[in-house]
Regions:
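Acidic/polar-rich alpha-helix caps and helix-coil junctions
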Residues: 3-73, 81-84, 94-260
Length: 260
């Protein structure tokens, strides 16, 4: 609910909903992964006694695996190489060499660098781990963003600091006046490969920029070079209405930029 209110610009309601989600989840035993837990928590299903921080997930069994269409296959040098990180993101993250999130990246000097959030764990060939959709970390970041937008710096610091210090206990935002950029940068680092960044940029009226830089740790990266920059006016932000739906309703108007 907090995410919906954010997209509507209703930040007071977004803050209330995010805080309610945090309180409700923690009352039920959910908690942010610790710095020590973070690198290996991915790919391991939670238990009733230790639910971790994943609030909503898609149940996934080995027999459910779509094989070469699975998330792990998209994110592997043995697969399609379609979910590799960019050099610009890597350079943002490695500004702090002690950031625990560096430990979920893997590098193949011959090819690309990957995020190991969806790959098989413990020597498995096919992952049977559930796929996380909503984490407690996201609720904290939603609360921090909404607090910045409503001018409540104390709450913004409270919620953002939990994520910052989990990434590196030596860091803190205590005593700082936080900006939207501070929160969005932390969202970019924490929620990488979870489907948020483009929407974070677009809903805040910013421009998506694919920055073409080099880094000695990464041999290759991928960009859609046809669209190096775009904003909320770009027609492909909205998908076309399927032709089947258009055929079923002659009064239906196709989304702008697509042929009726």
């Amino acid at each position: 609910a907090s995410d919906v209110y954010k997209r509507q610009g209703e930040y007071n309601e977004a803050l209330t909903m995010a805080e309610n989600a945090i309180k409700g989840a923690e009352k039920e035993g959910y908690a942010l992964w610790t710095n020590e837990e973070y690198p290996t928590a991915w790919g391991n299903d939670a238990s009733a006694s230790n639910p971790g921080e994943i609030l909503f997930e898609i149940v996934n069994l080995t027999t459910d695996s779509p094989g070469k269409e699975s998330m792990g296959y998209l994110n592997s040098y043995n697969g399609y190489d379609d979910m590799c990180i960019t050099c610009s993101f890597y350079q943002l993250l490695k500004k702090d060499p002690k950031d625990v999130r560096l430990k979920i990246l893997s590098f193949d000097k011959k090819y690309y660098a990957y995020v190991n959030k969806y790959q098989p764990q413990q020597g498995e060939n096919i992952t049977d781990a559930n796929i996380p959709l909503i984490r407690l970390s996201e609720a904290y970041l939603n609360a921090a963003e909404a607090a910045v937008q409503t001018g409540d710096n104390a709450k913004a610091v409270k919620y953002l600091n939990s994520i910052v210090q989990r990434a590196n206990p030596e860091n803190s935002v205590e005593g700082k006046t936080l900006t939207l950029e501070n929160v969005l940068d932390e969202r970019r680092k924490e929620l990488v490969a979870e489907g948020h960044r483009m929407y974070d940029v677009i809903r805040n009226g910013m421009t998506v920029k694919r920055i073409d830089v080099k880094d000695s740790d990464i041999n290759k990266t991928k960009h859609n070079t046809a669209y190096m920059e775009y904003d909320w006016n770009f027609h492909k932000i909205l998908l076309p209405i399927p032709q089947k739906e258009m055929d079923a309703n002659p009064n239906m108007k196709q989304n702008p930029g697509y042929v009726d």
